[in-house]
Amino acid sequence: MSDTNNHSKNIIHRILTEQINLTSNELDTKSTKEIVNIFSEADKEPQKAVERVIPELINAIDEITARLKSKGRLFYIGAGTSGRLGVLDASECPPTFCSNPDLVQGIIAGGIPSLTRSSEHLEDVSEIAIADLKDRNFSYRDVLIGITASGRTPYVIAALNYSKSISALSISISSVPESDSTLDNDIDIRLITGPEILAGSTRLKAGTATKMALNIISTSVMIKLGKVYGNRMIDLSVSNDKLLDRAIGILFDIGSVDKDTAVRLLKKTNGSVKLSLLIALSGMDVIDAKQLLNDSKGNLRTALISFKDN
């Protein structure tokens, strides 16, 4: 009896992301084909996890959009893989949507060096998170998305606590149930993908689900901010030949202009696809088109409706 009790006391409780995945047991004995098949099957879980949190994603997108329309900014914060995913998503916003680099920012424990070299020990230093936010003048107007697969990263927990304390919008993304971790937030996104193929390696299923969620959040917010027309990136930054070709294609498809006209419009508008489209579709000159876009808060569809109504 006493031996049994002692054994029970010594049982380790593992949070979900640290538990053993029975389908990948004895992984080192599998053939290459078997390993790939195990991964292929496991990678169906991230999609299911995202589908389960659609209501939370909708809420997050609408709340973030409202904050950004009121001069707020969006910050991702995390350590290790979670931090890298946030930095990756934030860094893609300026070239994709021509957004100000300050509008969406990614913060990783340890800063830029941690993007290429592991600094996992820094995830336990709570004070650094608050300092990182203060260095960026993080305020009540802003939004913080704290990313922590385990739901237990001190760096992220401290950031969320600070965010809540100053009434900023606080959103958490984790891959464990509330029974494993309770986080201080306004919106709680739980991407439950189960135990990893490699126990504890949350760069796998948890990381994939997180990347999917961040794609949805940032892209949807930018759509709401008028950065997209139809399904085209009309606020893209024309900075290389590939993007110039894309811009010309957008003007051809939506503005119904030939290549030479598209190039002339882009030169006239300093590479602004959105402004070029408004000119092509309305016949307005640059000054009037620019004024109408400003009056329409940068939304091309709103500007076109206003032009037609007048």
UniProtKB/Swiss-Prot annotation:
Functional pathway: Amino-sugar metabolism; N-acetylmuramate degradation
Active site, UniProt feature: 92, 123
Reactions it catalyzes: N-acetyl-D-muramate 6-phosphate + H2O = N-acetyl-D-glucosamine 6-phosphate + (R)-lactate
Domain called SIS: residue spans: 64-227
Highest rank taxon of the organism: Bacteria
GO annotation terms (biological process): amino sugar catabolic process; N-acetylmuramic acid catabolic process; peptidoglycan turnover
Keywords carried by this UniProt record: Carbohydrate metabolism, Lyase
Family: Belongs to the GCKR-like family. MurNAc-6-P etherase subfamily.
Other comment: A lyase-type mechanism (elimination/hydration) is suggested for the cleavage of the lactyl ether bond of MurNAc 6-phosphate, with the formation of an alpha,beta-unsaturated aldehyde intermediate with (E)-stereochemistry, followed by the syn addition of water to give product.
Function as written in the Swiss-Prot or TrEMBL entry: Specifically catalyzes the cleavage of the D-lactyl ether substituent of MurNAc 6-phosphate, producing GlcNAc 6-phosphate and D-lactate.
Protein known as: N-acetylmuramic acid 6-phosphate etherase
Gene: murQ
